[in-house]
Amino acid sequence: MASSPGNTNPHNPPPFDLGTIFKPSSNPYPPPTGPFLNNQYNQQLYAPPGIAAQPSPVNQTQQDVSSSSSATNLQPQRTLSYPTPPLNPQSPRVNHNPGTHILALLNNGGAVANQEPSHHNEIARAFPGGSGPIHVPSGKMPKGRRLVGEHAVYDVDVRLQGEIQPQLEVTPITKYGSDPQLVLGRQIAVNKVYICYGLKGGSIRVLNINTALRSLFRGHSQRVTDMAFFAEDVHLLASVSLDGKVFVWKISEGSEGDEQSQITGKIVVALQILGEEDTKHPRVCWHCHKQEILVVSIGKHVLRIDTTKVGRGEVFSAEAPLQCHLDKLIDGVQIVGKHDGEVTDLSMCQWMTTRLVSSSVDGTVKIWQDRKTQPLVVLRPHDGLPVNSAIFVTSPERPDHIILITGGPLNREIKIWVSAGEEGWLLPADTESWRCTQTLDLKSSTEPQAEKAFFNQVIALSEAGLLLLANARRNAIYSVHLDYGSSPVETLMDYLSEFTVTMPILSFIGTNDHPEEPFVKVYCVQTLAIQQYTLDLFLCMPPPRENVGFEKSDSTVSREANLVESTLETSGMKPTELPSVGSVPKPSILVNRSENANMLSFPAGPASAGITPPAIVPPNGEPKTSGMPSETSDVDSAYAPSPQLPLSPRLSSKLSGYHTPVEAFEQVLPHHKLGGKTSSADYFYVRQTDDVGGRNLDVSSVEENCRSKDTNVTPDDDVSGIRSPSAFFKQPTHLVTPSEILMGVSSTEASITTEDKRDRDANIEEVNNDARGLEVELKEVGEAQTSQNGEINYHETTENHTSESRENIFCSQASNLSTEMARDRHPITEGSAIPGDSMAYGQPLQAGDERGLDSRDVSAKLPESGSSSGLVATNSKGKKQKAKNSQGPGLSSTSSNVANLADSFNEQSQSLNHPMADLLPQLLALQETMTQVMASQKEMQRQLSNAVTGPIVKEGKKLEVALGRMIEKSSKSNADALWAHFQEEAVKNEKALRDHGQQIMNETTNFTSKELNAMFEKTMKKEFASVGPTLARVVTPVIEKTVSSAITESFQRGIGDKAVNQLEKSVNSKLETTVARQIQAQFQTSGRQVLQEGLRSSMESSVIPSFERSCKTMFEQVDSTLQKGIGKHTSATQQRIDSGQSQLAHTLRETISSASSVTQALNRELAESQRNRLALTAAGSNPLVTQLSNGPLGALLEKVEAPMDPTTELSRLISERKYEESFTSALQRSDVSIVSWLCSQVDLRGLLAMNPLPLSQGVLLSLLQQLACDISTDTSRKLGWMTDVVTAINPSDQMIAVHARPIFEQVYQILHHHRNAPGSDVSAVRLIMHVINSLLMSCK
């Protein structure tokens, strides 16, 4: 397949060297690529970490670390309060990567080779409980960073110990040099079948993921800024470009005849939005459930487009799209709202109602609701800085679990917002309030300018619980894990992983097509290629809290590790006799675990995986070998089999007090690492409780010994504040909620724990006082058991205990509630404790509290001799202890009784040589204990049945409500979709029927008016022309025959044959000529006349009237159009003339008024100067001028001053309704008192309400300024006048455009100083200031 030279994206691009573009990956486990990839990707997808084969040296260290921290199903994760559907593990997929498939198809010319995958490297891994195979994590295990607190900061330049930023597994799709502009928007869109991305010229390339078919959609003339599919299984693509063109394409495939199948794009909507200039990133967003509704942002406007109403009845064209101006919207387009700056992002969600969020460079985020013109809420999430992203994220488990994620400038600051209601649930309301719950701030410590260090694109994958940020400046992808929690307010970002890519990412999109697969496919538009990266969800999840010591973290918590050699010393084994971990046939349970046991803290990061754990050096200086698996240990040491416990999905997943070492569990990955969601059934809860025995034995030698051996224990290792499982389960059974897990011990449980601790404190004194007797008892018990068996086989003992413990395990969590009374499970690790150790110090072991003794400390104090009196004393104290423990409420008493029963049985078996009198008290005590045990069991069963029924019914109701909501929502969405589809089909059918009917009418009219008359006339002429000769030929033989026969009969008798023959000949000839002539003459006269009359009547009755009516209608339309056009033209011309004359008249009036005011001013000044001169003259000539002021001089002065009263002139002008001249005269005097008097003489409000205004804009502006200058006097009246005047001013008037702004600012400043005016004046001042502020904004 050769492509044309002009095609920038050929159908079959030649192979290119990946080494020149993409960085080689050092990952020892490349991604699965199927049969189509080259050898560089032909690696194994599924590899079992726990098979019998020896691992290779390359990944040996990695497997060792995984074996130490693989029990991820025991980690205390947050449980969900709603049901979670189970995950069905899928079989391994041969080719899960569509990008690989496309690359192979393109390189092979579109032909898909049916090649069987190679299986020589694949090994089927068997998972406990039927789990399927999983993807092997990359050899570069990324160690992310936990995000803690409401404000988390991540420095991209700081690398903590062990942090790795691996390069993602890449699959090239095509080589293409994209436009390297860093802009917002999605330049690529992907669904299950197609990949679409924009080219430089505005075209859109479409690729079929499965068949590698390609197509090019043309229509946009500039760069495509955003595109999106309606859904992953609906082939509706919406795109928008810089020129404001909006297209909706319906993608389909088909073939004509024997031709190859082709991808076609039918244009559903072609629209161009006009009225916005200099748009940088128009955006597009589909409605959540309605595929006919589309939301588009163009510049500052947000538009809602109904594709069923836009251009109804028209055929759209990509070359000439339908134009829609923002000032005059067409049918089907409406404005949702507007920002003060350009809109940067759109997102929608639906719960109870549909919400649309829009972000803008003006720093605001607005949330809109259907059929409301005002936003529900306006947020300024980033202190007024531009907002680049706003995304609604909905939990995949609950449709009402909705949060809002916003991104600041460069998407460097990410915030989570939830509704301010109870627990953050969204409820329908006219107004809403949102609050920020967490902030993630990305920073660079080496680059002070953020623009040079960051340009992030953001997408949210709600199904996978991930927030992905692609930094084009650093060639990196930051994966932020979202922990949804049980409510929106508990949703938080808890983990961040960083990955590197080969080149800058300009735009990207992510998909999770198969939720059962633990992968996210990220499709990227990069500077030199279109590529697909595979992101393993296993690498993005936060590691469990219990394994926090083995991961990189900035936390100060260190991980405890129980060492095997802590128990070897008590059994007499030397360190060199320690058996290999791989040789242990069964897992063992350590009983002697206490807070004083030796703990080992490993350094953070994966570097610890390649370093042998440090040896533990006891006080004598001899090093001991650690119990952790080393690099050279066998594979079986990392994965030892363990009993499978089926989980009960709704009950608490806590273990009932039994401690299991890490080696006792297989590496069972939780479902969420297989691509699903974390549910309440995915995890156990292992609560490490205090070893009461170790805590209560406050012996100085024990403490000193433990301090010397455990120097790495941090304060966080003290878990004394955590309640024990037995204390927790003394109360009736109930479902554990996250709040109970976080809040710890409730009030009732706290009181029980306090009481139990008080009893244990009472036991300390007895233990300290009789330590000697206890030591003797320990020795005798050990000797008794040794003498019975002769020798001790540690392997056999371990196996017996382990198998016995497995038989006693209940297979549901509900049974764990009564484990203290139903199990006696004390298997012991090889050499970890002396057999019979459960009777040490006379205190029975309680399974819930894990009471036991450190065998090292006890054995160090054992004496060389003993006596039987110590055993008697011990037995008596054991009975006291039984009495005390039996007084405790609930399950603690039952647990103690079970332990005492076991102790009594051991004493009986060890004292077979004693007399029967010694056994009688023990038998009585045993009988009493058995009775108490039976009663406790019955009571516990009753409590369990009562406690379990209530929560189950409650959860059933919750499940019923949730299912009802889900069904209602699904039914509503389906009904809406069906109704929309029905309406769409009805409209299409109606349109088709209407077009068909119109076409039939047109054809019928054309045939009747044009062709029918001509055909009829032509046919009639032709037929009548041939009728005459035909009729003559038919009639003549009949007449001849008749006449001849008649003549023959009449003349046969008298006339001879000769006369008859002559007469016949003459008659025939004459008759023939006569008949022919008559017939011809008859048809030429009567026939022609009849035909002409028929044609004439037809024309007069049908054709001519219809033609006249058509002509009349046509001429009437032409006449009306002409008259309307002439009228419009005349009115426009008249308006133009009137406007010109009005401006001239206005100018003349202003000139006259100004001249009159100047004249009046000159008269006033002349009179004033004349009066002054007269006064000076009179004073200089006659000193008695003051006495004669009432004489002729006084009259002269009065005569000069008499015309100076302006109110008379103003009153005359008002009476003549010359308001413009009166106000101009008053304002020219610059006397505010005269202006105030004039305002009081007229009804200013009514005057300003006239249309047109009698006062010009210049007079109004001057009046506002002068009234404001004297606002301190008569404030209330002047504020009222100013209010009327300011509402009548039009700042866009060209007459005052130059002077409006400075005068408005002056008035605003004057009013600003009078904001403290009394009473009602304050509201008037604020109102005028608000109006002036609006006018100032419009003057820009």
Swiss-Prot record:
It is found in: Cytoplasm, P-body. Pfam families: EDC4_C, Ge1_WD40. Belongs to the WD repeat EDC4 family. WD repeats lie at residues 219-259, 338-378, 381-427. GO terms for molecular function: protein homodimerization activity. Residues 1-101, 611-644, 700-719, 783-806, 828-897 are annotated as: Disordered. It comes from Arabidopsis thaliana (Mouse-ear cress). This is Varicose-related protein. GO terms for cellular component: P-body. The modification Phosphoserine is found at S91, S648, S680. The gene is VCR. The keyword Disulfide bond does not apply. The keyword Hydrolase does not apply. Homodimer. Component of the decapping complex. Residues 1182-1226 form the LEM domain. GO terms for biological process: deadenylation-independent decapping of nuclear-transcribed mRNA; G protein-coupled receptor signaling pathway; mRNA catabolic process; mRNA processing. Keywords: Coiled coil, Cytoplasm, mRNA processing, Phosphoprotein, Repeat, WD repeat. The modification Phosphothreonine is found at T79. As a component of the decapping complex, may play a role in the degradation of mRNAs. It comes from the Eukaryota. Residues 793-806, 848-859 have a biased composition (Basic and acidic residues).
